Amino acid sequence: MSVPKLAAPRKHRDLVFVSAGLDLDGGGRALAGRLLARTCCELAREWEVGCEILALGRSGAPAPARYFGADQRGLALAAWRRQLSARRISLVFDLIGPARVQAWLPGPLRAPYLVPLYGIEVWRPLGWERRRALVHATVRLAISRYTVERARPFCPELNGAHVLPLALEERSPEGAVDLELVSHLGTGFLLIVGRMASGEQYKGHDQLLETLPRVPGARLVVTGDGDDRRRLQGRASDLGLRGRVTFTGFVSEATLAELYRRSTALVMPSLGEGFGLVYLEAMRAGKPCVAARDSAAEEVVADGATGFLVDRDDPEELAAVLGRLLASPDLARRMGEAGRRRWREQFSLERFQGGLRPLIENLVGVRG
């Protein structure tokens, strides 16, 4: 009687992607998460391994996902249970918060995992869970050298972090254009895009509002929302900027793309970005960027070529740069074209996926 052969043990690990939220209104962090999730799903299909997505929020995943709403504990328990099962898996987290579950697992039970480092979440003293999650990560992935340098005092183990800049693909934006809004705004305005949070007043909204009176005729469109919006609106009113500053609130992707197209430049002199995806959005749209010196923007914006880097606390310097761009459409156009070329060459989706591929190969056990 012939004896049936046992199936060979599985060599490769399935992927489990664990997300702090992928919703379209989640800002740059969620966009970066969608970028990671998409790459993981595409690589899993190529390698014929499983890819499961567990996420807070309600939507945004590039493949079927299990959503947990605001239930962080439920997400952590799901990630825990996946590792205690007999299944061979590797995990990719899209933020250090959900990765805290790894701190509670002893080494023999802990699956290989990747943790990305964005910025402010690691630029401060870390609790023991976050610190341990970073220390034991198989792969630590930083989105800029700036992020690593600012985080190093709080976690010296980051010496081994891989630096991989974020990217944007070229695609048609989702949603409908708010024609009434864009028609009202016209063209030739300055644009700042980002969340307005009272606990994160680092994006440069205040500095930009205080500079605007020094630039005669300049108009500013402020896109985004948050609990600090009311204060900023009051500040604009106090500065006598009625009619020159428009707060749009949250807008669709299609409306945002049209705002970029109609603007003269993106102006966001932020000191709190670990990278700054909005700079890539502007570059993709062929618009120059005005950003802060001594920030992560130095790794994205080529000073004098694709925009300007300024001392954001020097209103005269900022005003001079804004006035120069508004007075010279040819200069703004040339810088915008250079920015679009730089985006294609340095920050394309293909370049990002090529850099991420060997890191995920290591987690899954595939060798290219």
Model segments located where?
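Short His-centered aromatic/hydrophobic patch
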Residues: 93-99
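Conserved donor-binding/catalytic core segment of Leloir-type glycosyltransferases
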Residues: 16-18, 181-213
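Conserved acidic donor-binding segment of nucleotide-sugar-dependent glycosyltransferases
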Residues: 303-304, 308-315, 324-329
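Aromatic "clamp/platform" in nucleotide-sugar-dependent glycosyltransferases that forms part
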Residues: 271
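A short, well-ordered alpha-helix in the C-terminal region of glycosyltransferases
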Residues: 317, 324, 331-346, 352
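Nucleotide-activated donor-binding/catalytic signature segment of Leloir-type glycosyltransferases, i.e.
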Residues: 230-251
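Short hydrophobic beta-strand element within catalytic cores of glycosyltransferases
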Residues: 288-291, 301
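Short alpha-helical donor nucleotide-sugar binding micro-motif in glycosyltransferases
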Residues: 250-251, 258-263
